[in-house]
């Protein structure tokens, strides 16, 4: 009996021991199966890697560093970096820099500022603790910089007054005041019909190759007459940002500014077509920060965004690669906010804030003249008016090819030079009547005298508004020309001789009535006596022409 009991106990111990031995094997098998099933689910890749990385002894702090899970198309997905901020700069161990755009559970989506070929899977990524910031101050004048504010013109380091974040909040309602000072472009068609004020956002919109950049460039060149002086309140510093353009185009622009002695008061921010999409997305914000330094220090600046269509395309590319939900035309839902937060930074500040201003001239490229597309309508609704350039007018030789009917300035009339407002008041009405009559005149030759008169004057006014590139006119030169056109002094002159009349009339005034031009420039308005003198001078010249 005792022998039987001992045998049963021995068998029990053997079974218990074998069960204990089997448990780890079963657990290992289950773990293997679970791992296999996990591999089949890509969404859990980050958690698997997290477990593995945690298993490595003394791995660097995951709050401050991370490891690359995957890289491609200029996007790196990184595990770790638990304490990272949105839009913070990071540095890869290969030396490439990037910016955190997507903060997701378990991983961070980082856009790369350099080539993604240099970044490898498993590579270490470190936080820098810095949100994207750029150098600002007068030391940038005459320089060409990239989207991060680094000099690319070979003229050595920049003597910056400080650094500013690329993306900052726009001024609120109380620090602003209404637009009341003019930005003179030197273009008769713009200054007379769609005037721009300091602190305004005026959109330049049109198809490719219709002269959009030419309008902006002439505006920059026209500021030379004030920037060469010593009156800081009249100076207008210019910032030009090239987004997605050819490098040869940017080089040509710099050369043009240098030839006309305009580079000394200008800053070029370039994110060319060959550069990464994140840099094209960032460049306008960098330029805005550079311009804001002048605004916030009681000075005046003009910023040209050329063009925001390409910035929207770059942002769409980034958003789709980061797997953000697409909306209309595959743009992300916040593309409106992209442009509104940028353009709201243009403002005229109150006296309490220093009376500085930042004026924006955003450029938008349309396809086939379609201004009702997504991005054009967005920017039209954000801005204070638009200058619409038409391919049809451009090919007819009417340059600048401004469609006067579709172009408007919603706040600029309050800032228009009074003398120009006095003579150009009826110009828009004459041109509107001319367009209406010209459409019907094609179908019939039987026209009454008043219709013929409208056609004659409209043709001459259209011809008068033509202007060669790089030849901006001062206000005191524009006023007599528009006065002559609106008051019918050109009606008897042949259409082909209007250009000749323009140059001869200005030469005549400078030689014989220079005090008249000086008075218009200094007073800025036409008194009764000045108007009588202008009428007399115009009539005497037309009689001899």
UniProtKB/Swiss-Prot annotation:
The protein's name in its UniProt record: ATP synthase subunit alpha, mitochondrial
Binding site for ATP: 206-213
NCBIfam families: atpA, PRK13343.1
PANTHER family xrefs: ATP SYNTHASE SUBUNIT ALPHA, MITOCHONDRIAL
Main location: mitochondrion
Keyword annotations: ATP synthesis, ATP-binding, CF(1), Hydrogen ion transport, Ion transport, Membrane, Mitochondrion, Mitochondrion inner membrane, Nucleotide-binding, Phosphoprotein, Transit peptide, Transport
Residues with the Phosphoserine modification: 57, 178
One annotated GO biological process: proton motive force-driven ATP synthesis
CDD domains: ATP-synt_F1_alpha_C (cd18113), ATP-synt_F1_alpha_N (cd18116), F1-ATPase_alpha_CD (cd01132)
Gene assigned in the entry: ATP1
GO molecular function: ADP binding; ATP binding; proton-transporting ATP synthase activity, rotational mechanism
Subunit-level organization: F-type ATPases have 2 components, CF(1) - the catalytic core - and CF(0) - the membrane proton channel. CF(1) has five subunits: alpha(3), beta(3), gamma(1), delta(1), epsilon(1). CF(0) has three main subunits: a, b and c.
Family: Belongs to the ATPase alpha/beta chains family.
Presequence extent in this chain: 1-35
């Amino acid at each position: 009996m005792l022998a039987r009991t001992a045998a049963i106990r021995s068998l029990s111990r053997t079974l218990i021991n074998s069960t204990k031995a089997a448990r780890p094997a079963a657990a290992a098998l289950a773990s293997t199966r679970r791992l296999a099933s996990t591999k089949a689910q890509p969404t859990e890749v980050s958690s698997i890697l997290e477990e593995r990385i945690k298993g490595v002894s003394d791995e660097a702090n995951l709050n401050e560093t991370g490891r690359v899970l995957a890289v491609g198309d200029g996007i790196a997905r990184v595990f770790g970096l638990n304490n990272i901020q949105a839009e913070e700069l990071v540095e890869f161990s290969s030396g490439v820099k990037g910016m955190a755009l997507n903060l997701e559970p378990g991983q961070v989506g980082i856009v790369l500022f350099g080539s993604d070929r240099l970044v490898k899977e498993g590579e270490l990524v470190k936080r820098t603790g810095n949100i994207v910031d750029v150098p600002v101050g007068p030391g940038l004048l005459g320089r060409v910089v990239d989207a991060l504010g680094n000099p690319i013109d070979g003229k050595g380091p920049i003597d910056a007054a400080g650094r500013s974040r690329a993306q900052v909040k726009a001024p609120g309602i109380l620090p602003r005041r209404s637009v009341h000072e003019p930005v003179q472009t030197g273009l008769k068609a713009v200054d007379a019909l769609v005037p721009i004020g300091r602190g305004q956002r005026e959109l330049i919109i049109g198809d490719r190759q219709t002269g959009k950049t030419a309008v902006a460039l002439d505006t920059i060149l026209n500021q030379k007459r004030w920037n060469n002086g010593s009156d800081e309140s009249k100076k207008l510093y210019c910032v030009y940002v090239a987004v997605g353009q050819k490098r040869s185009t940017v080089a040509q622009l710099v050369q043009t500014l240098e030839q006309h002695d305009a580079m000394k008061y200008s800053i070029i921010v370039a994110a060319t077509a060959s550069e990464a999409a994140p840099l094209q997305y960032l460049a306008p914000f960098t330029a805005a920060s550079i311009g804001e330094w002048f605004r916030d220090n009681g000075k005046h600046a003009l910023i040209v965004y050329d063009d925001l269509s390409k910035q929207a395309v770059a942002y769409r590319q980034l958003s789709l690669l980061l797997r953000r939900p697409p909306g209309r035309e595959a743009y992300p839902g916040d593309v409106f906010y992209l442009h509104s937060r940028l353009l709201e930074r243009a403002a005229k500040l109150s006296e309490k804030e220093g009376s500085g201003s930042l004026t924006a001239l955003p450029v938008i490229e349309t396809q086939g003249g379609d201004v009702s597309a997504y991005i054009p309508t967005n920017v039209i609704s954000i801005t204070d008016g638009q200058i619409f350039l038409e391919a049809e007018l451009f090919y007819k030789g009417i340059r600048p090819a401004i469609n006067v009917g579709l172009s408007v300035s919603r706040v600029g009339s309050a800032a228009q030079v009074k003398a120009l407002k006095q003579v150009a008041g009826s110009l828009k009405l004459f041109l509107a009547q001319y367009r209406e009559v010209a459409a019907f005149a094609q179908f019939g030759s039987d026209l009454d005298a008043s219709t013929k008169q409208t056609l004659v004057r409209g043709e001459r006014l259209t011809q008068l508004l033509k202007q060669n590139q790089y030849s901006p006119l001062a206000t005191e030169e524009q006023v007599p020309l528009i006065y002559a056109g609106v008051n019918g002094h050109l009606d008897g002159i042949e259409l082909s001789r209007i250009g000749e009349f323009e140059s001869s009339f200005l030469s005549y005034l400078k030689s014989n009535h220079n005090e008249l031009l000086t008075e218009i420039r200094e007073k800025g308005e036409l008194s009764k006596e000045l108007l009588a003198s202008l009428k007399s001078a115009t009539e005497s010249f037309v009689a001899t022409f």
